[in-house]
């Protein structure tokens, strides 16, 4: 069973560590690995906007760099008045590294919406999309 309250609190805590001097849109993420460990992610902006990275990818890449390969759930918290879903780049990474993973979208008012990575990107580009076979580029 997933403790969504704990994941949401971890994402809120992470959100306080963001570097968002341009958008002023802090995002915190908390990713639950199959090991039971929680990996936090934050968005980090750069004056050269394309170099900015999102909280969701920071959490996933951090977990992957620590050897985690199974993912059970992700909570994403913003200060938006409505829910904010991951950007297209994050959706692509999520659907490849954690297909079908439950994702909780939440704001600071405590409103929540539960979805999953596959629903966020219904027609993904997958390893099989590479000429039909992974590794055949």
Q: What kind of feature is each model-predicted range?
A:
Residues 2-20, 68-137:
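C-terminal binding/interaction regions
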Residues 10-13, 55-62:
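Short, well-ordered amphipathic alpha-helical segments that serve as non-catalytic structural scaffolds
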Residues 23:
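Active-site segments that bind and position negatively charged phosphate/pyrophosphate groups
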Residues 26, 43, 75:
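Conserved beta-strand segments that form the floor/walls of ligand-binding pockets within enzyme
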Residues 26-33:
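Short beta-strand scaffold segments in enzyme catalytic cores
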Residues 32, 61-67, 96-97:
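Alpha-helix C-terminal capping segments
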Residues 37-38:
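Hydrophobic "anchor" residues
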Residues 43-57:
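Compact, glycine-rich, soluble single-domain proteins
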């Amino acid at each position: 069973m997933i403790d969504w309250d704990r994941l949401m609190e971890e994402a809120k805590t992470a959100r306080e560590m963001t570097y968002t001097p341009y958008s002023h849109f802090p995002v915190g993420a908390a990713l639950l690995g199959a090991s039971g460990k929680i990996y936090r992610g934050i968005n980090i902006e750069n004056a050269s906007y394309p170099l900015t990275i999102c909280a969701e990818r920071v959490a996933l890449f951090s977990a992957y760099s620590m050897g985690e390969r199974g993912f059970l759930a992700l909570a994403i918290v913003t200060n938006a008045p409505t829910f904010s879903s991951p950007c297209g780049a994050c959706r692509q990474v999520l659907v490849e590294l954690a297909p079908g993973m439950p994702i909780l979208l939440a704001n600071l008012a405590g409103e929540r919406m539960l979805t999953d990575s596959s629903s966020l990107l219904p027609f993904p580009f997958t390893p099989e999309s590479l000429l039909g076979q992974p590794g055949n580029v």
